[in-house]
């Protein structure tokens, strides 16, 4: 079974468990996004670059309030695709501090309406999904409880 077939199987399991997120992990350059794109192509799933979620309407919201409105605004955008399975690429776009988005909460809320699949741009440490700022300080730490983790082998 190749990596795309393996991922398809994991996503199909996630679809059966409504309210699930599939996180694809792997080293930088391991092909996380490539596998997601290929799976999206095979199954005709909706592939969304997270940069497309950052609309002028979102940016017009006062920075401190963006985290409150992001889940509903993003769900509305994703609903316009009329798809059950959503591939979110470039997740790190949502980590920008001025957006004030709690990515963990966002993915959990979106997963109530869609099966969310995304590549994790960071690493796993002590069982948590972690992402560091460019200066090397830890920026995000998320418990993967309730998420399906699938690792790309390089």
Where are the predicted features?
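Short glycine-rich substrate-engagement loop in P-loop NTPases that contacts/grips substrate
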Residues: 52-78
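N-terminal pre-Walker A segment at the start of P-loop NTPase domains
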Residues: 1-17
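Hydrophobic anchor at the beta1->P-loop junction of P-loop NTPases
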Residues: 24
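Hydrophobic positions on the alpha1 helix immediately C-terminal to the Walker A/P-loop
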Residues: 35, 39
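Conserved P-loop NTPase "ATPase switch" module shared by AAA+ and STAND
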Residues: 81-99
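P-loop (Walker A) phosphate-binding loop of NTP-binding proteins
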Residues: 27
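Conserved glycine(s) of the Walker
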Residues: 31
